[in-house]
A protein has these predicted regions:
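A short helix->loop->beta-strand "cap" motif at the edges of active sites that frequently abuts
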Residues: 64-67, 89-91
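Rossmann-fold NAD(P)-binding glycine/threonine-rich loop
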Residues: 59, 72-94, 101-115
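Short catalytic-loop micro-motif centered on adjacent basic/acidic residues
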Residues: 45-47, 68-71, 95-96
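Beta-loop-alpha module in the N-terminal Rossmann-like domain of NAD(P)-dependent dehydrogenases
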Residues: 37, 41-63, 74-79
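C-terminal substrate-binding/catalytic lobe of Rossmann-fold NAD(P)-dependent oxidoreductases
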Residues: 2, 10-39, 118-187
Length: 188
């Protein structure tokens, strides 16, 4: 498969190595400098850039009729508009805030526990630690965990830092070369 990598940071470089190891051809390594290059030689694009570039990169994929997998977080305020563009162009996009099987199991467990907590007087906080190269804070994973709780409880939203009684506080730390730690805490 011919792959265009849109975003060539830590994750883009990891995907590059894995794709090559599996016999795929990486035909484009776009670092984000300048306009999105010609995507016509790619069969698929993998988008792991920065929040400011994600929507533009996705739109370029739709315009080039290239299916795209996106793992960039921090741009979801533009998600409804991007979905409309994708549908209007008969494009194909897969988005997830985290592609780890283990984390997606955690998302389901999180929602199950949130339904159990609904009628109990618990507050919720989320603490996360990631490496210092992680650009967004909080991470998309922490936001997805918070949104799963909000959907199934009386919590009204989330905030970065300490939350009020009906808010989930997300404390995001960045240190060293930590791979990523998410800790949820329910309290009375």
């Amino acid at each position: 498969m011919k792959i265009a990598l849109l975003g060539y940071g830590k994750m883009g470089q990891t995907i590059d190595r894995l794709a090559m190891d599996l016999g795929h051809e990486v035909v484009l390594r776009y670092t984000g400098d300048g306009p999105t290059p010609d995507l016509s030689t790619a069969d698929v694009a993998i988008e792991f850039s920065v929040p400011e570039a994600a929507a533009g990169n996705l739109s370029s994929c739709f315009e080039a009729d290239i299916p795209v997998v996106c793992g960039t977080t921090g741009w979801l305020d533009q998600y409804p508009e991007i979905i409309k563009k994708c549908e209007a162009s008969n494009g194909a996009m897969i988005y997830a805030s985290n592609f780890s099987i283990g984390v997606n199991l955690l998302f389901h467990l999180n929602e199950y526990l949130a339904r159990m907590m609904k009628d109990r007087p618990y507050g919720v906080d989320i603490e996360e630690t990631h490496h210092t190269q992680k650009l967004d804070a909080p991470s998309g994973t922490a936001i997805s965990l918070a949104e799963g709780i909000i959907e199934h409880t009386d919590m009204k939203g989330w905030t970065l830092g300490n939350g009020a009684e009906t808010e989930i506080g997300i404390n995001a730390r960045r240190q060293g070369d930590v791979k990523g730690i998410q800790i949820g805490r329910a309290h009375v």
